[in-house]
């Protein structure tokens, strides 16, 4: 039997970069229709800022293996809503995931298919377990990049379509200088 070789990589804890990783950049234009305040979205779209970057080390898409990635989620808001990742269910919904906060301040918004939502604040050292069947999105509630590590089954896949179509049942906003998790008026059951 030929065995896969182990690897060891250093993550730059200041920048979130994993040397040699596959890099994905998501700009505001990639998040059209995700934010509530369309007027604020269109105004900020003139600059089309980078909202987040992902540095992924991916394995062959097969059961039993693991992928890992860092995400650098930049600070910012569209209207009152903090910058966030697209969010997804797993294509194989019975797959779980682990997130680990490295730098900055934010949180994870999780949701069942029926819309039951949980908000878990995150900072350096916070570990979040995402159970099977829960959609998840990270949100930067701070003033610096929010950097975290994700570890997930190589065969989990991503279902972005369900979130694009229905959204999350809650949104994370700043109101009166505080982080608030409120009902999303556009959420569809």
UniProtKB/Swiss-Prot annotation:
SUPFAM superfamilies: RmlC-like cupins. GO terms for molecular function: glucose-6-phosphate isomerase activity; iron ion binding. It comes from the Archaea. InterPro entries: G6P_isomerase_archaea/bacteria, G6P_isomerase_prok, GPI/OXD, RmlC-like_jellyroll, RmlC_Cupin_sf. Fe cation binds at residues 88, 90, 97, 136. It catalyses: alpha-D-glucose 6-phosphate = beta-D-fructose 6-phosphate. HAMAP family: G6P_isomerase_arch. This is Glucose-6-phosphate isomerase. It comes from Thermococcus kodakarensis (strain ATCC BAA-918 / JCM 12380 / KOD1) (Pyrococcus kodakaraensis (strain KOD1)). The lineage of its organism: Archaea, Methanobacteriati, Methanobacteriota, Thermococci, Thermococcales. The gene is pgiA.
């Amino acid at each position: 039997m030929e065995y896969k070789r182990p690897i060891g990589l250093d993550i730059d804890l200041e920048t979130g970069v994993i040397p040699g990783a596959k890099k994905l950049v998501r700009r505001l234009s990639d998040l059209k229709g995700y934010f509530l305040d369309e007027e604020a979205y269109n105004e900020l779209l003139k600059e089309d800022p980078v909202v987040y970057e992902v540095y992924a080390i991916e394995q062959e898409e097969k059961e039993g293996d693991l992928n890992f990635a860092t995400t650098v989620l930049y600070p910012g808001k569209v209207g009152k809503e903090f910058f966030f990742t697209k969010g997804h269910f797993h294509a194989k919904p019975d797959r779980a995931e682990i997130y680990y906060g490295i730098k900055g301040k934010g949180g994870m918004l999780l949701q069942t298919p029926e819309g039951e939502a949980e908000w878990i604040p995150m900072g350096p050292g916070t570990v979040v377990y995402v159970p099977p069947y829960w959609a998840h999105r990270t949100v930067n509630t701070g003033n610096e990049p929010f950097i975290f590590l994700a570890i997930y089954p190589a065969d989990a896949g991503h279902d972005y379509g369900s979130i694009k179509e229905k959204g999350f049942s809650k949104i994370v906003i700043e109101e009166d200088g505080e982080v608030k998790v409120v009902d999303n008026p556009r959420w569809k059951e």
